[in-house]
C-alpha cells in the first residue's frame, strides 16, 4: 500500500509541476498522504464484527499461476489445467499494472527473438510510467520484440482505442474479460505481466515448469531492481 501511495504522490507532484489547474487541492492530498505514511495504519474490523463467511487460503499451497478464463473473471483455473493453449494476442497494460510489471516483462523479453505469430500490445497506465520506461531504455526492448506501443491510458482494456481481430485467443493483464469487450468473439485469459511475457515468446500458455524456469532465471535475480 505504501509503495502505491508513494507512486501516487510522485504523480500528483508532477501534475502540479506541469500546471494542473487546482494545485491547492492536489497539494492537500499530497500532504495528507505523506502524513499517513509517517505512521501507516490500515483499517481493522471491530473485535465483535460478524462475517457472512470466512475464507482462509494457505498461500504456501499455491505453487503455480492462476488465470481467469474466457470469458468470466470468476472462472479461474491453474496454469497446468490450460497449458499449451495457443495465444494470438498479448496485452500488457491497464490501471492494474505498475512500472515494475513492465520492467519484469522487459527482462523476460531481453535477448529473445520476435515471435511473428503473436501480436504484443504494450500500454503503460500513466504518462509518468511511460516517460520513465523510455528513460530506462525499456521501450527499446519492447520495440525489438515487435510490440505495438500504445499511448498511456486504457487501450485494449476498454477496447475503445483499438480492438483485436475477431475470435482470437488473447492473454491480458487487465481485470475484465467480458464477451466482446476487447474483440468480437475474443477468448480472453487474464494473468500476470510476467506470464504474459513468457506466453508472448512461446505463442501459447507455457507449462508451470517452463514459466517458473524463465522467472527464476530472468526476473527473480533482479526483483530488488524491478
Where are these regions (language model features)?
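Fe-S-dependent hydro-lyases/dehydratases of central metabolism
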Residues: 1-226
